[in-house]
Amino acid sequence: MKKEGILNSELAKIADDLGHTDQVCIGDLGLPVPSGVKKIDLALTRGKPTFQEVLDIYLENILVEKIYLADEIKENNPEQLKILLTKLSADVEVVFVSHETLKLMNHDVKAVVRTGENTPYSNIILQSGVAL
């Protein structure tokens, strides 16, 4: 049994298998998951686990070179955005796209991780970097 790192076996497998430029999405309760894309449903109740809790686990365990966020988060959930941006290293590229574009991008991610988050536009696509 692992005693640290990502303990959830499905989350760990996705993180372990990410190659350079591979992507994983962390989403809120309402984010649709495209047919054929792996869904890891962590939602226990409304609000648990939070988007930030799940994001923290991935940021601690994978090298992220770029993130994608819905542009709508700026106006509709600025506090979530503010907290999120403070967690990123300075070299992470931040790209804002429309929420519709973000949903379309989910067709190409390795997995969508569903949290219990119930605040608007709490969705992110993490793009894996390379440690060379």
Swiss-Prot record:
The protein's annotated pathway: Carbohydrate metabolism; D-ribose degradation; D-ribose 5-phosphate from beta-D-ribopyranose: step 1/2
Keywords: Carbohydrate metabolism, Cytoplasm, Isomerase
Reactions accelerated catalytically: beta-D-ribopyranose = beta-D-ribofuranose
UniProt subcellular location: Cytoplasm
Active site: H20 (proton donor)
Entry keyword Isomerase: yes
UniProt-listed SUPFAM superfamilies: RbsD-like
Binding site for substrate: D28, H99, Y121, S122, N123
Coiled-coil region list: none
GO biological process, one term: D-ribose catabolic process
Pfam families recorded: RbsD_FucU
GO cellular component terms, A-Z: cytosol
Known function: Catalyzes the interconversion of beta-pyran and beta-furan forms of D-ribose.
Protein name: D-ribose pyranase
Source organism (scientific name): Lactococcus lactis subsp. cremoris (strain MG1363)
